[in-house]
Amino acid sequence: MAATETSTDASNKRLKARHDYNEDQDDNDLEDGDSAKAEATTTKPIKTAPAKKPALVKKGSEAKTPIRTGAHTNTVMPTKLSLPKAPEGCVKLTSWNVSGLNASLKKGFKTYISAEDADVICLQEHKVNQPLLNLVDPKVYPFSWWGFEKDKKGYAGVAIFSKTTPLNVTPGLPTHPDPGCTKGRIVTLEYPTCFLLGCYVPNAGQGLVRLKERMVWDVAMKEWLLQLKAKGKHIIWTGDLNVCHKPIDLRNPTTNTMSAGFTKEERAGFSAILDEVDLVDTFRETQGEGPEAAGQYSYFSYRFQCRVKGIGWRLDYFVTDKELQKERVVESVIRDECYGASDHVPVVLVVKGAL
């Protein structure tokens, strides 16, 4: 580091600390699994340097406590977890952005995995460069698949573990202009009754510098889902989709309309996928949008006491076709109490019958 810090450097550091969730900033002061994501205030796209300092939330007006009665505010993973088993004849799937497996393993990863006992485990942002041995019991999960970032080591990455072996596996996003760069972002498993897609959608980045790239992804994602739908099987699309679809999906919508994950472009892109492929957000379909449904989020920044204050974003989803939602979805929930091994909490889907 240079001995003298320029005003531009200082401004950029402030922006980085206050921006909602910049997934790919190199920050040597943070341990693997930490994040520069922060629920703060609005930022504008950076077109020229130096970056402008975002407006601060007026002192005294920021959130103090969760808006949901009974919301969990623990900042470490509970040492003992008792989670419901899947009903007889049902399959349980869990999806979790672990924000760095090496860190998550030290903070309760296996406590959650053991307690949930899901039939399928979908992980995102594992940040490792090769498969980790004994992460799960291979006798329980005989099928495993790992996807790694093409050009950046220790970045992104997806993995899936399943108690039943799928018929086929398609790594990456075949409809993307550069499919090779997507293998650390998505995998599609074909089962007898459905296609399961485990996905870590790229976000638009600090200052929305990658918003156009994100829009390319959304178009390619829609095309891939349409191709799968044409094959006549159900669709289950899950993962960190890096979008808050509606204002109810984050604590401070009015101050984040220019923040990655809540721009009108990203929300419209997600709406287009749901509408044109005829899919539904299972959690919102189940919970509704009334006051009683507010305050349920899947991501809380490690910074600024966001977890304790209930300042969160709902970025993690299970999306299905409408027929599956109507006839087979039993439960779609956020495991709010399972926080501490990541800045995200797991989301869970239970469906009737086999995959």
Would you name each region that the model predicts?
Residues 125, 173-174, 280-292, 332-336:
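Acidic carboxylate-rich catalytic motifs and surrounding loops in phosphoryl-/glycosyl-chemistry enzymes
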Residues 173-178, 201-218, 254-259:
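Surface-exposed cleft-lining segments at the edges of enzyme active sites
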Residues 219-315:
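Metal-dependent phosphoesterases centered on the DNase I-like endonuclease/exonuclease/phosphatase
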Residues 126-127, 132-206:
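Structured beta-strand-rich core segments of catalytic domains in phosphoester-bond hydrolases
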Residues 153-169, 306-327:
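Conserved beta strand-loop-helix elements of the APE1-like EEP
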Residues 2-139, 145-146, 150-156, 273, ...:
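N-terminal, active-site-proximal structural segment of metallo-dependent hydrolase catalytic domains
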Residues 96-97, 113-132, 196, 225-247, ...:
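Active-site beta-strand/loop signature of hydrolases that rely on acidic residues for catalysis
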Residues 332-355:
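Surface polyanion/phosphate-binding segment centered on an Asp-His-Pro turn
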